[in-house]
Regions:
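ATP-dependent carboxylate-amine ligase
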Residues: 3-6, 10-30, 35, 103, ...
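A transmembrane-helix-recognition feature enriched in membrane-embedded lipid enzymes
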Residues: 16-76
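Compositional signal for N-terminal targeting/processing segments
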Residues: 46-49, 53-55, 184, 395, ...
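Walker A (P-loop) phosphate-binding motif
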Residues: 61-129, 140-147
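Aromatic/hydrophobic pocket-lining residues that form π-stacking "cages" and hydrophobic walls in ligand
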Residues: 97, 182, 342
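Residue-level detector of anion-binding/catalytic polar loops
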Residues: 107, 171, 192, 321, ...
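Phosphate/Mg2+-binding loops and adjacent switch elements
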Residues: 114-265, 270-272, 279
């Protein structure tokens, strides 16, 4: 622990020390960490980014040349993803598209990796259509059948659990092997539309459509590839997008950004949308409050997300007096001790309420004594511009044309 780039008491468990190290690593990437050690770490990360770039482009070449075959499941597969790591507002978009397709009569299943979810001690029991027990080795984690929620966030993962809880009539399946999950969704759940959550980089399964999200405030993240930056792929790989969604817009023109995006993709329809807060909901009681409830209240924010600045700024924009900011690593699983320690700090500072994100709320253990109310901020997506393109997307998915329709053909547009 003495070797860590920050002071950690020797009594602190290794798990907590590693969590702090992960937060520091994010601070290095985003430029928040200063000093000699942070500078040296950035130099090392920059060198590794060159290696990472070569690996990414080689992998794309392998699939483009078909040296490694993609799997086709005989049904419609749509990927929703981004070029960067986190922060684009993907989950609300997945929820919106899933709900829209469901309402139009499609039998939708969401396929997710279940990032940082825990492994089940034993596979779930599932009976095949013929009444026999489904083979355990072919069984993914079934979060929701669309009618019943079967797993909690610990075993499902944050986003899959949140989506399953919010989407009646939409199945949610988790497995690192999305081909395996897709086969189960089609064969056992009767899905005719598979939404590949965070699926742009998942090339083992053929996509009919790739929807790529671009954060208006940071279109290409920090501008550098992993691990020095937040880019998973070079910007030129945007050429693989079938549709581009610019997220977190505020209604002002995006002409300069659109011109930049057109350098990499000249044909994909561009849709502009906003991620707006709708209401506050108490984490444990479900009681809802209007957004005006925040105005002039002494507030503490706690989160474990990739880019917390936007979340915290949103709280301030709603008129809250944000006095305490507590940041954990992305997808951090809060312990009761951590929450109670944070709540004690809030009491000592006379905070009137605590606000977190909806994704973090699913990981909150209930404290023994809740001295300050804890709310999550419900965020929903609204299309601002590109309604025709959005309607065209929905129409093509709900009413597929003849096989010659270019949007439903197998895509080979991998970056050269």
């Amino acid at each position: 622990l003495r070797l860590l780039p920050f002071r950690v008491p020797l009594a602190v468990p290794m798990k907590e020390a590693l969590a702090e190290l992960e937060v520091w690593g994010a601070d290095v990437i985003f430029g928040r960490a200063k000093g000699f050690r942070a500078g040296m770490m950035r130099l090392a990360m920059s060198a590794l980014s060159g290696v990472y770039r070569a690996i990414v482009q080689t992998r794309l070449l392998v699939f483009r040349k078909r040296w490694k075959q993609q799997h086709h499941l005989g049904t419609l597969v749509v990927s929703i993803g981004n070029l960067t790591v986190g922060g684009t507002g993907k989950t609300p978009v997945v929820e919106l598209l899933s709900r829209t397709l469901r309402d139009e009569g499609r039998r939708v299943a969401i396929l997710s990796r279940g990032y940082k979810s825990r492994r089940l001690k034993e596979p779930q029991n599932w009976k095949s259509k013929d009444g026999t027990k489904f083979p355990a080795e072919k069984m993914p984690k079934l979060v929701s059948t669309g009618r019943a929620l079967l797993l909690d966030s610990k075993f499902a993962g944050d986003e899959p659990f949140m989506l399953a809880r919010n989407l009646d009539g939409v199945a949610v399946v988790v497995d690192k092997d999305r081909v395996k999950g897709g086969r189960f969704a089609v064969g056992q759940l009767g899905a005719d539309t598979l939404l590949l959550d965070d699926g742009l980089q998942y090339l083992h399964l053929s996509h009919a459509i790739d929807i790529v999200l671009i954060d208006r405030s940071a279109p290409f993240g920090t501008g550098a590839l992993l691990p020095r930056g937040t880019l998973r792929e070079p910007p030129r790989n945007l050429c693989r997008a079938s549709y581009i969604l610019i997220t977190k817009c505020d209604g002002t023109p995006n002409d300069a950004l659109i011109a930049k995006l057109r350098r990499y993709n000249r044909v994909a329809p561009i849709i502009e949308c906003t991620h707006g807060p709708r209401y506050l909901e108490e984490v444990f009681t479900g009681q809802r409050q209007p957004l005006e409830f925040l105005k002039d209240k002494w507030t503490a924010a706690i989160s474990g997300i990739a880019v917390p600045e936007g979340f915290e700024r949103g709280i301030e924009d709603l008129g809250a007096r944000l006095e305490i900011r507590r940041r954990f690593s992305d997808h951090h699983r809060f312990s009761r001790k951590e929450i109670e320690k944070f709540m004690q700090r809030c009491v000592e500072r006379d905070m009137e309420l605590v606000v977190t994100t909806e994704k973090d709320a699913v990981r909150f253990p209930r404290p023994k004594e809740q001295t300050v109310p804890i709310y999550f901020l419900r965020i929903e997506v609204e299309i601002l511009k590109g309604h025709d393109a959005w309607n065209d997307l929905v129409t093509r998915l709900c009413h597929p044309s003849a096989p010659g329709d270019p949007v439903l053909r197998h895509r080979d547009a991998y970056a050269q």
